[in-house]
């Protein structure tokens, strides 16, 4: 509580009277702050900190931030289907002071997404995992990967059943055996490995994770940018959006499309290079079209025009 009017009145006693006083205080606080008139959209505080102004980056207003940036529990629960998680975020980021600070994750030591089964390590499949990682590493927010997910470690195992199952047979089992061996890194996502860890790093999802991580690291717009999914700038894609970040030394713009084609409109003319395939497109009419993509495939066209 940041309002001293209420914080200073809180009673830290444990008697029935103390508890009753605090309950009444909570009710009084609620009634005083409540201005709900039947239309949540008109009364709920909103923020544009995560959104581009058109396709122009703007500074963030953190004046209403609580200081308690969140793990993105809502997206987490919906990551059984990446598009559901994405749609929720696009429609609700306005209710967070700055969703670019949200930590995105699929699973954790407590829960998997609601579908297929939140009580077990995620069993949605390798392709769904890859699609989720595409979104996590190119959308707003901070990606977070739970240990072992890059090899679908213990998928289908109950995450926790207390003393009723052994730790080894749970989703919280020891992962160290997968990391035995040697890794020599020469640069970000560039390495040689031997032993069991080499097999771990050679798994399809590990390779995919390394790729999307390297793409994110190379493109400032993906690391720190705001986004827009407005139909003024992109149509036709299930998960397609424009990312941009600008500071005194950087102007980074990227066009992202995941698992479907899309048409980007009203964008700067010039050269665009796809960070995934290396494909080059030259835009002359403000429009760039991405052909249809299969699930978990992605294109990230980076603007290399003059000034970028």
Q: Model features per residue range: what roles?
A:
Residues 117-126, 281-292:
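Short, polar loop/linker segments at the starts of domains and inter-domain junctions
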Residues 1-98, 102, 125-126, 132-135, ...:
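Active-site-proximal helices and loops of the catalytic beta/alpha 8
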Residues 254, 284-308:
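C-terminal beta-strand-rich structural cap/linker in extracellular carbohydrate-active enzymes
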Residues 115-118, 147, 156-159:
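Short, solvent-exposed loop/turn and secondary-structure capping segments
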Residues 107-110, 140, 259, 276:
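Short, flexible loop/turn elements at secondary-structure junctions
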Residues 109, 113, 140-144, 155, ...:
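A generic secondary-structure signal for well-formed alpha-helical elements
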Residues 108-111, 125-126, 135, 144-147:
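Glycine-rich, aromatic-lined ligand/substrate-binding cores of catalytic
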Residues 98-122:
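Active-site clefts of carbohydrate-active enzymes
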């Amino acid at each position: 509580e940041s309002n001293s009017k209420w914080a200073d009145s809180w009673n830290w006693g444990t008697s029935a009277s103390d508890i009753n006083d605090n309950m009444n205080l909570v009710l009084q606080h609620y009634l005083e702050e409540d201005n709900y008139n039947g239309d949540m959209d008109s009364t709920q505080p909103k923020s544009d900190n995560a959104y581009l102004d058109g396709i122009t980056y703007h500074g963030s207003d953190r004046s209403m931030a609580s200081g308690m940036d969140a793990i993105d529990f809502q997206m987490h629960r919906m990551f059984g289907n990446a598009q559901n998680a994405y749609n929720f975020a696009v429609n609700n980021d306005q209710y967070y002071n700055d969703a670019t600070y949200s930590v995105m994750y699929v699973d954790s030591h407590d829960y998997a997404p609601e579908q297929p089964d939140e009580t077990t390590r995620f069993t949605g499949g390798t392709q769904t995992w890859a699609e989720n990682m595409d979104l996590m590493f190119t959308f707003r927010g901070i990606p977070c990967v739970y240990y072992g997910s890059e090899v679908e470690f213990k998928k289908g195992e109950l995450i926790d059943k207390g003393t009723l199952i052994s730790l080894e047979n749970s989703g919280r089992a020891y992962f160290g055996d997968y990391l035995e061996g040697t890794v020599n890194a020469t640069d970000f996502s560039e390495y040689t490995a031997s032993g069991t860890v080499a097999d771990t790093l050679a798994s399809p999802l590990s390779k995919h994770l390394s790729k999307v991580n390297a793409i994110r690291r190379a493109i400032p717009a993906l690391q720190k940018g705001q986004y827009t999914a407005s139909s003024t700038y992109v149509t036709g894609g299930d998960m397609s959006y424009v990312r941009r970040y600008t500071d005194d030394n950087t102007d980074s713009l990227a066009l992202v499309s995941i698992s479907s084609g899309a048409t980007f409109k009203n964008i700067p003319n010039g050269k665009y290079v796809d960070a995934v395939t290396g494909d080059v497109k030259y835009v002359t009419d403000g429009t760039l079209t991405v052909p249809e993509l299969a699930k978990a495939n992605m294109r990230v066209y980076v603007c290399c025009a003059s000034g970028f």
